[in-house]
């Protein structure tokens, strides 16, 4: 049903002759839920070959479908293995509309980047490598290239970032090579101590400098 109706939407955009000025994005917020019942529904998902599922920061909870349709602007049938994240959708749409990225009140930088150069080049211009950091209920992750750090430090530490930093400093995290081990089954912390130390310090530095911003309070009409 979903596939049929997405097809109807694309057909309608073509019929209205607005396809060259319309971007359609299909993406999920998380990997499939592998549990049944009230939380998972009747038909549990399968995220193989990845470990984990929805509500985890293993790859089974993070890796999702991501498709973009922009007729005449993005190469049809292009497939990319470059790493991207949800923040990139916002930056990409702004770039397509010719709107500069916001300055975030002049403090924290925009984390997403436009994917248009990558898509318009048919993948010849790679997406720059960067660290991707995840946190959900004490499940911490950092990915850079094929390497990924992971740990569960407990839910009671979030969003108390100072307590979380102290916990991370005194915790042993797992180190995976996703290129060779997409199921996150082999901890390489002891085999690759230099990689481990660099990524762990980057993760600690990130949470030590978390400064969540909220948008300005909306004004009330008539006041």
What are these regions, as identified by a protein language model?
Residues 181:
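Intrinsically disordered, low-complexity polar regions and short flexible loop motifs
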Residues 1-8, 17, 45, 88, ...:
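Extracytoplasmic/secreted proteins, especially bacterial periplasmic and envelope-associated proteins
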Residues 18-24, 64, 128-129, 144-147:
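Loop/turn elements at helix/coil->beta-strand transitions in domains of secreted/extracellular proteins
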Residues 32-57, 74-78, 82, 87-174, ...:
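C-terminal cap/loop subdomain of S1 sulfatases and analogous C-terminal strand-loop tails that border
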Residues 6, 23-28, 66-67, 89-94, ...:
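Beta-strand elements within well-structured catalytic alpha/beta cores of enzymes
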Residues 1-38:
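Metal-dependent active-site segment of extracytoplasmic phospho-/sulfohydrolases and closely related
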Residues 63-65, 172:
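Short glycine-rich loop/turn motifs
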Residues 128, 203-217:
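Bilobed periplasmic-binding protein-like "clamshell/Venus-flytrap" ligand-binding domains
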């Amino acid at each position: 049903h979903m596939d049929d109706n997405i097809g109807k939407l694309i057909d309608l955009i073509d019929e209205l002759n607005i396809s060259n000025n319309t971007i359609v994005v299909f993406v999920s917020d998380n990997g499939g839920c592998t549990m049944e019942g009230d939380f998972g529904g009747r038909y549990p998902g399968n995220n193989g070959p990845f470990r984990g599922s929805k509500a985890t920061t293993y790859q089974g909870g993070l890796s999702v479908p991501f498709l973009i349709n922009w007729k005449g602007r993005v190469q049809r049938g292009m497939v990319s293995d470059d790493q991207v994240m949800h923040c990139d959708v916002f930056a990409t749409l702004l770039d397509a509309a010719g709107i500069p990225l916001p300055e975030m009140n002049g403090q924290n930088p925009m984390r997403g980047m436009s994917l248009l150069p990558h898509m318009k080049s048919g993948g010849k211009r790679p997406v720059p490598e960067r660290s991707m950091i995840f946190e959900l209920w004490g499940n911490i992750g950092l990915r850079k290239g094929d390497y990924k750090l992971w740990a569960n430090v407990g839910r009671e530490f979030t969003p108390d970032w100072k307590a979380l930093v102290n916990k991370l400093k005194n915790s042993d995290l797992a180190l995976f090579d996703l290129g060779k081990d997409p199921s996150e089954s082999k901890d390489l912390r002891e085999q690759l101590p230099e990689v481990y130390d660099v990524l762990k310090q980057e993760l600690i530095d990130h949470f030590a400098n978390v400064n969540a911003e909220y948008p300005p309070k909306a004004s009330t009409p008539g006041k």
